[in-house]
From Swiss-Prot:
GO terms for cellular component: cytosol. The keyword Cell inner membrane does not apply. The lineage of its organism: Bacteria, Pseudomonadati, Pseudomonadota, Gammaproteobacteria, Pseudomonadales. One of its GO terms (molecular function) is RNA binding. One of its GO terms (biological process) is transcription antitermination. This is Transcription antitermination protein NusB. Belongs to the NusB family. The gene is nusB. PANTHER family: ANTITERMINATION NUSB DOMAIN-CONTAINING PROTEIN, N UTILIZATION SUBSTANCE PROTEIN B-RELATED.
Amino acid sequence: MISDESDRFNPRDPKPADAGKPSKSAKRREARKLATQALYQWHMAQHSLNEIEAQFRVDNDFTDVDGAYFREILHGVPAIKGEIDKALVPCMTIALEELDPVELAVLRLSTWELIKRVDVPYRVVINEGVELAKVFGATDGHKFVNGVLDKLAPALREAEVKANKR
């Protein structure tokens, strides 16, 4: 059998075995997107979290999704909703009840990450929240989300924010 040159390993052009597969951050981004939709549904329809999770797993392809992270967000946000909302209120110019439900879902998800997932840098949390608001929110919703999260991050991650401003 004659070997094809293209099959040989070329150290100048290394191709990892997982080339073409989504990265961990890409899988988490997809988990956040689905979790935002699921949290919106939970807020609007008041279905049980287990029902919503089961529906999302049937209706969506989880191949490129961090399923464990999706589940952690979906069950984690409602578990500390009171703490999340209490943290959000001082950073907002309008009442929670008046907020667009999509933006509320994004802000709750992002606040949960700031509180519970200190392994995720605050700048990543803010960026992901803004991107979610661009995808799902109203025309300028991302600007509102950015403003709220910019105020919230120093309150919840004071040391990390100060260290990054040096």
